[in-house]
From Swiss-Prot:
Catalytic activity, as annotated: (2S)-2-hydroxy-3-oxobutyl phosphate + 5-amino-6-(D-ribitylamino)uracil = 6,7-dimethyl-8-(1-D-ribityl)lumazine + phosphate + 2 H2O + H(+)
Any GO molecular function: 6,7-dimethyl-8-ribityllumazine synthase activity
Active-site residue list: 93
Family, as annotated: Belongs to the DMRL synthase family.
Documented EC number(s): 2.5.1.78
InterPro entries: LS (IPR034964), LS/RS (IPR002180), LS/RS_sf (IPR036467)
Enzyme class: transferase
Pathway where this protein functions: Cofactor biosynthesis; riboflavin biosynthesis; riboflavin from 2-hydroxy-3-oxobutyl phosphate and 5-amino-6-(D-ribitylamino)uracil: step 1/2
Protein name according to UniProt: 6,7-dimethyl-8-ribityllumazine synthase
Entry binding sites for 5-amino-6-(D-ribitylamino)uracil: 23, 61-63, 85-87, 118
Top-level taxon of the source organism: Bacteria
Record-linked CDD domains: Lumazine_synthase-I
Length: 181
């Protein structure tokens, strides 16, 4: 029997995408800084002008799953990191957004076979968000580390089983000009 476990030895070989929500940008920019620090320390060049990491900025967390899915369907990425912050307010809006973002990111990963790190903070107040984005620790680092480990793990499994990631559009038909690459 085989034992599969991700490592960080060959992280410099990975191609990654990071999707970041602009809403609550004070928090999201700190998460991004932690993410980039982790990538750099593991041999990945996080420079937006480089060839290893692409960045997609979206209006808010609710838009993250759609863009993550579109990026995953290109087949260019070993993993995708999603960063955002949903902070509870006085209305049920928080519950809807937090739930749908989590479901959308999970569904995208399962449907495409591409590891997607869920780095969307869901917190009760700004103080909690800031604590998780740098005051006490920066979870952006953890989300990047998770993506690297999962990319490595999926490469191990695929190299052993011969499976390739799906590059189909499971929820809707592909547009006629979609090349799938």
């Amino acid at each position: 029997m085989a034992v599969f476990e991700g490592s960080f030895v060959n992280a410099s070989q990975f191609r990654l995408a990071v999707v970041i929500g602009r809403f609550n940008d004070l928090v999201c920019e700190k998460l991004l800084a932690g993410c980039q620090d982790c990538l750099k320390r593991h041999g990945v060049d996080p420079d937006p002008q480089g060839t290893q990491v692409d960045y997609a900025w979206v209006p808010g967390s609710f838009e993250i799953p759609l863009v993550a899915r579109q990026l995953a369907l290109t087949g260019r990425y070993d993993a995708i990191i999603c960063l955002g912050a949903v902070i509870r307010g006085q209305t049920p809006h928080f519950d809807y957004v937090a739930s749908e973002v989590a479901k959308g990111v999970a569904a995208t990963s399962l449907q495409t076979g591409i590891p997607i790190a869920f780095g969307v903070l869901t917190v009760d107040n700004l103080q909690q968000a800031l604590e998780r984005a740098g005051i006490k620790s920066n979870l952006g680092w953890n989300y990047a580390l998770s993506a690297l480990e999962m990319a490595s793990l999926m490469h191990q499994i695929r190299s052993t089983t011969g499976e390739v990631p799906r590059q189909t559009l499971p929820l809707a038909a592909a547009p006629s000009n979609f090349a799938g690459t």
